[in-house]
A protein has these predicted regions:
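Charged catalytic cores and adjacent phosphate/nucleic-acid-binding surfaces used
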Residues: 1-171
Length: 171
């Protein structure tokens, strides 16, 4: 937000006047119920397919659960508010874990690399949005490459649905 002062009133004024300078968040596709899918075998369906199957999976006869994405589209009669394009980010810890091939950002190896990035650049947002690729590569070439792929929208997404989390991969 572009605010005149760091007060609640100034923040509300900035939001209502459309002074939004960055629209960023995480990949909604990683959610457990992002797409319409079977809750038993996780096969994904379009809304029309699920409706045609009467919300019963033709593969395993499990229940098909309406995804958040399809629900949002169904409810989207409100006109969109003008704002900058949505920048999808992945938490730095998850990027590091994926690059290192470890199961969690909470492993000693992942935490040590995370701490090295924070020590060098100050905070996670700076790393994810602003740190120069060459400087990041001095800490970790793999993480630098992955962050660049994220910034450029080259992340491969595997949407979640039916209670199974989505996932991502770097090219």
């Amino acid at each position: 937000l572009d605010v005149s002062a760091k007060t609640p009133k100034a923040v509300l004024e900035a939001v209502s006047s459309g002074s939004i300078t960055l629209n960023a968040g995480f990949f909604p596709e990683e959610g457990k119920y992002n797409r319409t899918a079977c809750t038993r075998c996780y096969v994904q369906f379009s809304y029309e397919e699920a409706k045609a199957h009467r919300w019963k999976c033709p593969e395993c006869k499990g229940r098909i659960k309406l995804g958040v994405r399809e629900r949002a589209y169904a409810m989207s009669s409100i006109p969109a508010t003008p704002r900058p394009p949505y920048l999808k980010m992945i938490p730095l810890g998850e990027v590091i874990a994926r690059v290192l091939g470890v199961s969690s950002p909470n492993t000693k190896k992942a935490k040590a690399l995370y701490d090295a990035f924070i020590e060098r650049f100050g905070n996670e947002i700076t790393v994810l949005l602003h740190a120069p690729e060459a400087e990041m590569a001095e800490v970790s070439a793999g993480v630098s490459s992955a962050v660049s792929a994220m910034r450029e929208g080259r992340v491969l997404l595997f949407p979640g649905g039916g209670g199974k989390y989505g996932s991502f991969a770097f090219p």
